[in-house]
């Protein structure tokens, strides 16, 4: 843990943190950066220690992307299933990092693999969280053609989370990729319709629509910034908030 100041009351009681697979790469071009995984785990541990119930959805883009494979000629459904298995690998790596910090963690997969992790069972996941355990949801929704962002929106709604936090490699939502266009406009707050009408690259339309229908706010922040997760939980730091109305 990094000693983040968590003396102020958290704004949220139960949250879902979506971590992209790419965020786990750190400065690498492929796979997992162990130091980055441990840093993110440390931030999660600080938030859990403050009494916040946390669940996660982790992407698999650092290992395999079904959409990219489909563009290269692979059957899309087959590619998506491979991508789902990649998320299980990432989930197990994050579980190991959290348990190294003595944070009790369970992995639940939408694709049953009993010898590796628990199957996804909604009520069991809720009980885990009530007992202070972190739950990592793996294998997306278990269905091809759905992104892990949509899986995050679905699980957040099922778990009754107060907010969906998307940890990315930049500190919010921009009109264009700020790493390619330093002058890109940054937004502090947007509505769901803003994101959809402007075709902003935050989440896919299905994920945004699911959050909108369930009145689930979305917060986008830089997960590579040490302690950022804890600051967002307290309503501090730099982030973009996506809500029904501004």
From Swiss-Prot:
The keyword Cytoplasm applies. GO terms for molecular function: ATP binding; UMP kinase activity. ATP binds at residues 18-21, 61, 65, 168-169, 174, 177. Inhibited by UTP. The keyword ATP-binding applies. UMP binds at residues 60, 80, 141-148. GO terms for biological process: 'de novo' CTP biosynthetic process; UDP biosynthetic process. It comes from the Bacteria. It is an enzyme of class 2 (transferase). Its EC number is 2.7.4.22. Keywords: ATP-binding, Cytoplasm, Kinase, Nucleotide-binding, Pyrimidine biosynthesis, Transferase. It catalyses: UMP + ATP = UDP + ADP. Homohexamer. Belongs to the UMP kinase family. PANTHER family: URIDYLATE KINASE, URIDYLATE KINASE PUMPKIN, CHLOROPLASTIC. Catalyzes the reversible phosphorylation of UMP to UDP. NCBIfam families: pyrH_bact (TIGR02075). This is Uridylate kinase. The lineage of its organism: Bacteria, Pseudomonadati, Pseudomonadota, Alphaproteobacteria, Acetobacterales.
């Amino acid at each position: 843990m990094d000693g983040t100041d968590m003396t102020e009351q958290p704004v949220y009681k139960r949250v879902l943190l979506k971590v992209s697979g790419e965020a786990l790469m750190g400065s690498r071009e492929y796979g997992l950066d162990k130091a980055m995984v441990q840093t993110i785990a440390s931030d999660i541990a600080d938030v859990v220690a403050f009494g916040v119930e946390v669940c996660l959805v982790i992407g698999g883009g650092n290992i395999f992307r079904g959409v990219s494979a489909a563009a290269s000629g692979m059957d899309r459904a087959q590619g998506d299933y491979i991508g789902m298995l990649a998320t299980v690998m990432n989930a197990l790596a994050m579980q190991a990092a959290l348990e190294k910090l003595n944070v009790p963690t369970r992995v639940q997969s939408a694709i049953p693999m009993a010898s590796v992790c628990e199957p996804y069972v909604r009520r069991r996941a809720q009980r885990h969280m009530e007992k202070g355990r972190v739950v990592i949801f793996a294998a997306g929704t278990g269905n091809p053609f759905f992104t892990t962002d949509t899986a995050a929106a679905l699980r957040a709604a099922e778990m009754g989370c107060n907010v969906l936090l998307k940890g990315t490699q930049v500190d919010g939502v921009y009109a264009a990729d700020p790493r390619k266009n330093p002058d890109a406009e940054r937004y502090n707050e947007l509505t769901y319709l803003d994101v959809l009408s402007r075709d902003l690259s935050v989440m896919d339309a299905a994920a945004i629509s699911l959050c909108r229908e369930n009145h689930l706010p979305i917060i986008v922040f830089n997960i590579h910034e040490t302690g950022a997760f804890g600051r967002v939980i307290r309503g501090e730091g730099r982030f973009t908030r996506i809500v029904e109305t501004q």
